[in-house]
Amino acid sequence: MEFLGQIDRKSIDWAFRASDLHNYYATKLIITKPGPLPNAGLVRFIVLDGRERERVELPLPLTLERGVDYRVKVSVHGSRFLTSVNGQLVSSWTDNRLSRGGVGFFSEDGESALVKWVSLSERDSFLGRIVSHFSLISFPTAGGGQN
């Protein structure tokens, strides 16, 4: 999954390998200290049977600001998960408890974000690898154009 988004308040949050609202992996890019020299972090956790488990917060080697576009890429290879922001790898971890599911975006109290576009690709099959090179899901922006 790859997307372009902006943080409006606090963070931008997404889920992957979501089989339902009670079982998924979650990741957040968060502004930990707003202001002229903001600090940023990445939070990741798993939700199993509706209960959040193993929340990890890591500092990011970059700054995040409100209203700035960030290109986020999430690569899933078996039980290995890689996250990059603007082409820079910021997280790598493994977990094998959830093997399949969808993707989505969410926000918790006090958080909001804008997602400008999302690109999804399936690479588990030969056809999926071919199609993924030509696929892009575009959503209209507030100005009526397509990104």
Annotate each PLM feature.
Residues 82-109, 132:
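Short, solvent-exposed beta-strand-to-loop segments that form ligand-recognition rims
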Residues 13-17, 82-84, 119:
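Beta-strand signatures of extracellular beta-sandwich domains
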Residues 49-73:
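Short, aromatic/His-centered strand-loop micro-motif at the edge of beta-sheets
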Residues 108-117:
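Extracellular carbohydrate recognition
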Residues 127-147:
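Activation corresponds to long, low-complexity, non-globular regions
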Residues 74, 116-120:
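Extracellular beta-strand elements of beta-rich domains used
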Residues 1-49:
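Secretory/extracellular carbohydrate-interaction modules
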Residues 1-3, 67-85:
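Short tryptophan-centered beta-strand motifs in secreted/extracellular beta-sheet-rich domains
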